[in-house]
Amino acid sequence: MIVRNTRHTALRLATLTVALLAVLGLVAACTKSSDAKQSDAPLPDAKTVIDASAASARALHDVQLDLSVDGSVPNLPVKSVAAYLTNQPKVSGQGDAEVTFNGTQVKAKFVVVDAHLWAQFGSGQAYQDMGLAADIYDASAILDPEKGIAKLLSSVRDPKVEGREQIGGTDAVRISGIIPGTALAGIVPKAALGDRPLTFWVQEAAPNNLVRANVGFDNGTLSVTLSDWGKKVALLDPKTAK
């Protein structure tokens, strides 16, 4: 009797195992089929994607920015920025930056409020008012619809969709093109730049947010990555924060 029950148990386990493997195989096949359909689908029209992305950028009020420089970029005193940016109810931002200040490379936390840049140069220290953000580097200008990422996108010449990629878990289309230096004013202020090669990634699904942009320079590359579009964050009060 014990032998029979053991055999029945083994048979049930074997049956369940086969069924489970069949289900897993079906799921895997469906996943591969879905992935294949997406990768085999025709690439979208570059202008259509760019127009939609520029419209989203103009309507964007909150975003997480990660900016980095590999090499050097003319007139840009920044090596890296990781920050939350907003333009409502007014232009503000906060985060961490590595910048050149008075000829020295320094790391600092910063807050931009009322057009002033406040910086903290060590944990527990008080924030110092460094003056007008525009006189140093105002990353929050990236959300300015007239000179930020919206301007960059709408100014791209000779755009070409090159393929699909995932950036930070977001399905995006990769587009290359040329960007005039004047369209970089919100990212590289005070720079007299000529045309620059640009590669950027736009969320393939609506609302087609800009995910990343790489701008080539003679001696370096500027990379801007955006995420958490529309997600609002509470700003610090630099007068009391430590």
Region locations from a protein language model:
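Bacterial N-terminal signal peptides that target proteins for export
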Residues: 2-18
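C-terminal motif of bacterial Sec signal peptides marking the signal peptidase cleavage site
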Residues: 26-29
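Subset-of-secretome marker
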Residues: 2-5, 31-242
